Amino acid sequence: MSIEALKTQLPAFAKDVKLNLSALPREDSLTEQQLYGLLVACGYTTRNGTVAQALEAEAAPHLSPAALDAAKAAASIMAMNNVYYRFTHLASNKAYETLPAKLRMSVIGNPGVDKVDFELWSLAVSAMNGCGRCIDAHEAVLREAGLSEAQIQTAVRVGAIIASAAVALEAAGAGFPEAAE
């Protein structure tokens, strides 16, 4: 499956989602590895098998095996970190912020790909998962590494588009009526 095949599964009410998905492969503000790694990391973050499989199939020809694994690792490690650090940030009892996390996350320090790419994928996943503390941390690393605000915004936009595709598929499968075109 590919982005084109994924688009054929989207309902009529998701016309804008289809158009946004169509634009993803033409995104030119990111490197090929950054863009296609985003597709994989964000695809798995949706927890929608159809979306994840389609985006991995689209991305695989553009990524090394190490980059493909790193993109999946970004989705996986951020799933853990985003829950934990969102809790410590949102909890009224600030004592939780002082306790050691006791979470193994060595992949962040040694992701097997360019650290900037892994950070970019982690930022987009963190945005999808709604963890402000992680968003701020990854954005700071990316800005220090020289990425522009436009590149960072692009990564989050890619995540938003992918999230919308997953919701559209689920809404259609849940019997939501299609909007008139």
Curated annotation (Swiss-Prot):
One Gene Ontology molecular-function label: disulfide oxidoreductase activity
Database matches in Gene3D superfamilies: AhpD-like
E.C. no: 1.11.1.28
Reaction catalysis annotation: N(6)-[(R)-dihydrolipoyl]-L-lysyl-[lipoyl-carrier protein] + a hydroperoxide = N(6)-[(R)-lipoyl]-L-lysyl-[lipoyl-carrier protein] + an alcohol + H2O
Domain of life: Bacteria
Keywords (A to Z) from UniProt: Antioxidant, Disulfide bond, Oxidoreductase, Peroxidase, Redox-active center
Pfam families named among the record's database cross-references: CMD
Catalytic site positions: 131 (proton donor), 134 (cysteine sulfenic acid (-soh) intermediate)
GO terms, biological process: cell redox homeostasis; response to oxidative stress
Disulfide bonding pattern of the chain: 131-134
Listed InterPro entries: AhpD (IPR004674), AhpD-like (IPR029032), AhpD_core (IPR004675), CMD-like (IPR003779)
Enzyme class at the top of the EC tree: oxidoreductase
Family classification: Belongs to the AhpD family.
NCBIfam families in UniProt: ahpD, ahpD_dom
HAMAP family, alphabetized: AhpD
Purpose of the protein: Antioxidant protein with alkyl hydroperoxidase activity. Required for the reduction of the AhpC active site cysteine residues and for the regeneration of the AhpC enzyme activity.
Protein name, entry field: Alkyl hydroperoxide reductase AhpD
Gene giving rise to this polypeptide: ahpD
